[in-house]
Amino acid sequence: MSKKTNAPVQEFEYKAEMKQLLDLIVHSLYTHPEIFLRELVSNAADALSKARFSSLTDGGLMAAAGEDAIHITLDKEKLLFVIEDSGIGMSEDELIANLGTVAKSGTLGFMQSLQEQKKELDGNLIGQFGVGFYSVFMVTENVTVETRSAQEGSEGLRWQSSGQGTYTIEKVEKKERGTRISFTLKEEYKEFAEEYRVEQVIKKYSNFVDFPIYLGEKQLNSVTALWQRPKSELQEGDVHEFYKFISNDFEDPLDYLSVSVEGAVSFKALLFLPQNAPMELLYRQGELENKGPQLYVKKVMIQNECRDLLPEYLRFIAGVVDTEDLSLNVSREVVQSSPVMAKIRQILTTKILGWFEELAVEQPEKFKTFYKAFGPIVKIGLNTDFTNRDKLIELLRFESTKTGEGEFVTLKEYVARMGGEQKEIYYHSGAGRAQLLANPNLEYFQSRGIEVLLLSDPVDVFVIPSIHEYDSKQLKSIEKADIDFSKEKTEGEEPVAENLLVPLLAKFREALGEDIADVVESHRLVSSPVTIVGGKDAMDSQMERMMKMMQQEMPAAKKVLEVNPRHPIIRNLSGMMIANADNPLINSAIRQLYEGALLLEGDLSSTTGFVQRMNELIEAATLSR
């Protein structure tokens, strides 16, 4: 314990945002009380890492009194909890910055939004958003932090707070560098004054901290750099625990990859494929800009999330990359421009894509799990990583009209089962499998057993058309299929006679007016009365919908309505035209057919008129009985 000096005690008031944040954390983390210990250990390890790193580049730092380690002391009777490190310590300005203000902009708003959505603030979020220290206020009423910076000329300081409106800072005598945190546990959390419980939590969350953690004289953790071990020596249990520690994920990884490279550049890496998409994909609209594996130089962490190690479409990969080919005091700018980093990135990308290919062949079910979670992200690489474009194309998987829901086909498999007459690879894009299969434009292909890829990922409409061709076969939307449907023999009912069809199509044009570009006879429909298609040079329907979502003022392109002259409804309309061309039911039926086609496409802007007209038509039909 440090001695108090005669220096005055300074009182500071938390900012309003900080008060709200403290209240939010304390009242939202009650189901995960053990998180406080994980966060305190993590902060202590970070302080030790900073001291170790700084000592290599700054000869004026105060040396540690003993081993670089974390010490925990418990008093079961008094419910006293103490955790101490010999790390970098803090100055007064650092105390105010680190313990008196919100660590990251936007943190409070983010957590409040989760609370409003009735989502629990789990331990992952606490760690990710830099507010881990404050979780200690869940298990105690008051906290004392005694610290001394390792910088030359530093003084001992004591920070105290009850987590309410204020905190105090005063000078104290402290001989050694580092930080000591002490507090009395609340009665309901007295379990954390028990040695077995503390050991349990340390092994669960902090077993691979790069510094020894002592409870009294007993070391609780296993300090080891797993990525330095040969793959043959890695134990799955250890690897999984290491992944959980570095990623703050509670689940085991789906798979992992051990990499050891010697040559123009030398490095070792241990990379992990998560079971599920990371938090950023759920809450930050897919932003992976600042993600990446941890970068170590000679076992010292340089960057926690190094975005320069992998291309953006692979930054969901967690792990550690350790090299001796960079200097320890490398800056962020040097990392970005370093030819060593560029080479490591190139090698890692090749290794990871090879890993995915291996999973697809040797563990297809595991690959399917990966693809469902991360396929949409990987596809982005088609438009950004042209060096590896061919490899990425081979990784693509699609549902199709010949697969079950949740089952996939590759482009290679598709081409292998194409019929001799088929010259193109056909796809259809939309909001989901059920909607895609209900689209009348599929009828021609399904009636002839022609497989069509079903694209339901929003990203598909941007990346798949860019492939253009595979194995000398062009990829074509079914709306753009290079098929002369008029030459195809259509079976079924006799069509409306040509001399009767012409005036009927004219009636369609009159009824729909400016809503449609043209109305023509369809040779592609089998069981539907009408369908809507784009013109030859028009944008794909799903692409048009996506563009509208991004640019709301974008004018809608007029489409062509195709009419199936063999369908009973069209034949009946022709009969009504013969009987009375001015029958108002004809216009109502035409409008209903058109809006029904829009509804199937997902493009009907309002259903009010559609439902009203449907009721009128049903009333007319029931009256005629």
Curated annotation (Swiss-Prot):
General function of this protein: Molecular chaperone. Has ATPase activity.
GO cellular component, one term: cytoplasm
Subunit: Homodimer.
Keywords associated with the record: ATP-binding, Chaperone, Cytoplasm, Nucleotide-binding, Stress response
Annotated spans, A: 1-332
Name this protein carries in UniProt: Chaperone protein HtpG
Gene name linked to the record: htpG
HAMAP family cross-referenced by the UniProt entry: HSP90
Organism annotation: Chlorobium phaeovibrioides (strain DSM 265 / 1930) (Prosthecochloris vibrioformis (strain DSM 265))
InterPro entries to which the protein is assigned, alphabetical: HATPase_C_sf, HSP90_C, Hsp90_fam, Hsp90_N, Ribosomal_Su5_D2-typ_SF
